[in-house]
Amino acid sequence: MKFLSFAILAASTVDGFVPGVSTLPKIVERVALNGIARPNLERTSKPFNEAEQNVQAIKEKPRPSEPKKVIVIGGGLAGLSTAKHLVDAGHIPIVLEARDLLGGKVAAWRDEDGDVTETGLHVFFGAYPNAMKLFKELDIEDRLQWKDHAMIFAKPGSKKREFSTFDFPAGLPAPINAGVAILANTDLLTWPEKIKLGIGLIPAYLFGQSYVEEQEGVTVKEWMRARGVPDRVTDEVFIAMSKALNFIDPDTLSMQCVLIALNRFLQETDGSKIALLDGSATERLCEPMKEYIESKGGIVRTNVPVQQIITHTEGKDKDSVAGLLLKGNEVVSADYYVSAMPVDAIKKLTPDSWRDKEYFSKMMGLKGVPVINIHIWFDRKLSTIDNLIFSRSKLLSVYADMSVACDGYSSSKGSMLEMVFAPAKGWIGKPDEDILQATMEELEILFPEEIRADGSMAKVEKFTCVKTATSVYETLPGCEAMRPTQISPIPNFIMAGDFSKQKYLASMEGAILSGQLAATAVQDLDFERSSSNFQLPAKLSERPFDSSVDFANEVTPDRQLYRVRVAESLPKEVEAELKTMDNYASVA
């Protein structure tokens, strides 16, 4: 009986991603709700309380006798998080961002009309404890717009405002809230399919994290078939989930990724509750992070791409970082260096002398996944709702009507649909107009009474298409062993970024946590070394920017991520100084 009860609970819990039918009256009630309260994470989320303790521990550790200068390469969430926690630890971070705006993969900018274009449709979950703690630390929690606790799926070809949905009842803990919400729903999966899937997932619940980690080497589809779960379950449920998690299909995504997400969402009462930022992530999140860092003595610079990591070639400091060459032949140096760049960028900048080291050679197997983010401004309001919607579309992952869901983009005139186009591998090189046409064809299926691909119904007033050729790292089977730890074999070089080792995989939460871990690594290494005879590697003299150098005045357009331009050689005076330093160290 106990086993049967567990199987039923597992089936109903997994089916938390498989909603029932919701029609117009219920949706109207949902849209009317405003000002949904922040969930009480202090009460419902053990990970949130752990995140609070970890941040407090950084602040309470002994202050350095001499604050160290730490250069952080990259002004996305990982880099800004690193710098935020470094100033909390009493050090002096200098953030170097290649573009002229902060945010990296969450960057956003305004066009000539004042409308915002985002790199991606970014949502925050209750199961993002470190992100939630960051908002609390910055005193900007009111900028998160929480939505009704529901997971909503489109029903392609259906009438206006008809969705597959399930609501998590308030007042019940996880996973009971998911089970209660789902048991009555039979919209997408039959009971035999639910039970088959539930039985397949029992080991994950019985053996926990150890079992989850063991599934890293198989794809979602392989895992399902090995357990006799029908392909229809994968098609109806896990295509949408896989595309939302990593922008790829279940025949390539590692099952570990799905199991980690399920555990995070279903072990925390408010884990799957969604919030959207009330505007541009660059303005509403990254700028407050910058202000916090600078108010405590840190520095944040933009439009300063790194072109070479300069390393010592001889002596006791061999292979350690001597400084960085920036555009315009500017040279900067520090006590420690943290890379918070995307994985494809640090792969390009990795010095030749490091590439044979196992730490870096493994990392070379990681790669970013392509994704496209689309904004379409329509001439009228569409039948949408105030929440994120899983599209269940061939080409679209998720979408939201930002004129309804986001205060910063609200409009009473027309809808602005923001959509994630994924998988994008076959589309990333195509013209924007072709991508728009394909998107409109998908929207005609999702909004059959309101949109026609030929534009004969709702009219497109304008659109933007943001292509990111290498976004978050592609979570393929076998890639977990390639992910680098924060501490590297180079004594003054630390790694951050969502691809580095941390438990939240490729996500905003993962990026923020990686920054905290990188800052902690600097703090702990420096404290250990302060009580020993360890000497930090010698530093190159800093040199000013020279505007006459090739590409010195080049600026990356807003809609593009910076593509690393590796310097072919060092300026002669820098090369001479480095040679003198290394020769002296060899003799000494």
Question: Could you tell me what each predicted segment is?
Answer:
Residues 17-70, 88-89, 545, 549-587:
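Extreme N-terminal leader/targeting segments of oxidoreductases
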